[in-house]
């Protein structure tokens, strides 16, 4: 696949395989749902806020930690509440989903899909993001070139800087935004997203490993994990320096 100029992978190591893997690992949400219902049964922030409100107002005596009630955040909640409660607000009118909080299904799926993309698009973790990096302007209505301080005010070019923004780095941000964006709406805890991303990564690793073991040729997959460490996946019985398709 990588030694003959006029030959490119298709069904086994081509784009079709990448799309196939993305579709399959998207089903990773089955794993967090088992953990949500059968293991942790962890309260949503909104529901936990209900416990705090009932104890703070003397209606119940739940065994909640004293540090919660020593914090000034409760008074801030009371000041901003239109109904004079200590409940945690959510962005959505319907409130939190009715299934348990931990781990986040969105984060799980994001971690799995982003891991597959890193394996295919930036296995070495050093590929510069193609083209110029853009960001929102002050009003948030238009895009402008991003100029990091290390580039002395110049737009970041394609592949001309050693310290460019990498494909892996941007994909990590994508997974983080999907996971932590749920926190912004008030329906998840931070730990739901952090753990969900890592669990999704494990799902993708196991799936890719199973695929490698089923194919006839030796091949290696590698990527930089969310921890920043390189992970190597190799067909059983093959050396780590086996044919690197990427």
In which residue ranges do the predicted regions lie?
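Hydrophobic alpha-helical bundle signature of multipass membrane enzymes
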Residues: 1-246
